Amino acid sequence: MHAQDKGGVLPGLSLLLIAVAMVCPSQAAYKLQERYSWNQLDFAFPSARLKEQALASGDYIPTNALPVGVEHFGNRLFVTVPRWRDGIPATLTYINMDHSVTGSPELIPYPDWRANTAGDCSNSITTAYRIKVDECGRLWVLDTGTVGIGNTTTNPCPYAINIFDLTTNTRIRRYELPAADTNPNTFIANIAVDIGKNCDDAFAYFADELGYGLISYSWELNKSWRFSAHSYFFPDPLRGDFNVAGINFQWGEEGIFGMSLTPIRSDGYRTLYFSPLASHRQFAVSTRILRDETRTEDSYHDFVALDERGPNAHTTSRVMSDDGVELFNLIDQNAVGCWHSSMPYSPQFHGIVDRDDVGLVFPADVKIDENKNVWVLSDRMPVFLLSDLDYSDTNFRIYTAPLATLIENTVCDLRNNAYGPPNTVSIPKQAAPGHSAVGPPLYTTTNQYRPVLSQKPQTSWGPSPPSRNYLPALNGNPGIPGSLSKLNNLGAPGQVVSSVSVSTNTVGPSGIEVPKAYVFNQHNGLNYETSGPHLFPTLQPAPSQLGGGLKTYVNARQSGWWHHQQQG
């Protein structure tokens, strides 16, 4: 028996252990799971013949399509494809996740082909970038009305907000931004949606990246206004140099871009966090200000500058969960970062939830859905714009993972660090001199918050393998066969990046310097102070007025538009 162990069983066991050792590190190192991937994008044409005609005419040029935005709702995963180059047949698309659980699915135009006709301003969307689904089952899409990029840009249509009812798949509103809200340099690529006490109490905020402004839109008033007189919207002249995928380039003119909204605070409003693209710093303002049209020229001191994230910390996309965890892309680092908003905004309180020098090259968009699942789209954008993509390789990927899994064992996971549950802080609130109070009754107290923290925790992140091609773990997702939850690790070895170690500061009232934090003061804005984290008590938004919850099924729609084009 012992001889058999040495000659038969043990070698087999050794091979098994080696195989496990090869598989487990990849699974352990990667938290984001690859769901979809493409060498080049494909679209769900009504027929093979129409697809061939589109290819022959140049209406469809597969290598010209780049995905930039992602959003999840029910059984649909929305993907936007801007018309930067010729041959983009649809700009607002989705994947039917019931029909395509993984792989490289065709993109289905939403809500149909006709609604994606370039230049049909009143009836269609010409170019969409980032999009947002709100808790009322509405999809918010800003049509930039542009075709081309940079010096090739033309403007066949004005900027227009399009809102779709996702239960009926119909557009329920279109609002053109007035000339006063834009300027000759305007380029708007990002959106944040703020739902207040009900679905009619809704605002959308738009970041004018190259026109250096912030636009507010009120659903109830069907009106918009622009905040533009603030230097925080401008790029940092010292942060215009970028390095992505071995390409050095300069985006020195890129201003306000990424935005996220906190949960509702005790005063009934949220905080909007934002960053210029050419910057490593985050800024903040209360939506109390943004919702008030009278404050557009009288709000300079209501905007507050936070600390920098650290080196190589450019970001284009950010989102915050309803319990205060902010996720953001780190495009220089091929990574997704995190910050818990109950902690000071300083590098020692920022974590890395995932990094991949192949799969996460330019993680263009980051979203958290209604089930607290995270979705990340990576697209190698600088390579697409400044060099040439290898279309025999996988270029575009969509990843997903539960938020709790991503932040586990990072400084953003307050359940497992030395800080314990955050203490409640209440900040005096009143209207600024000369301005009436807007919104719900104010919450006041004179108690000052002092954090008491124990020994500083140490959080380290190991390096991630350079590629991954396995299926995601899908346990718990409705409508998805359980057999697909097994991982199929096909990753290949490659260069390993250096590990990163981050530790937090020891903070306490015993004479040790406390990290800087930001809290709302009595002047209706934000104040810079050093007494510890800003811990805003949160109230949950009013539940959706829609009966029956979110719709979770949609059929692929074919309007017959392509047949009409062929006949015409």
Swiss-Prot record:
GO terms for cellular component: extracellular region. Coiled coil: none annotated. Residues 1-28 form the signal peptide. Transmembrane segments: none annotated. Controls the pigmentation pattern of the adult cuticle and larval mouth parts. It holds the Pfam family MRJP. Belongs to the major royal jelly protein family. It is found in: Secreted. It comes from Drosophila guanche (Fruit fly). The gene is y. Glycans are attached at N151, N222. Keywords: Developmental protein, Glycoprotein, Secreted, Signal. This is Protein yellow. InterPro entries: 6-blade_b-propeller_TolB-like, Royal_jelly/protein_yellow.
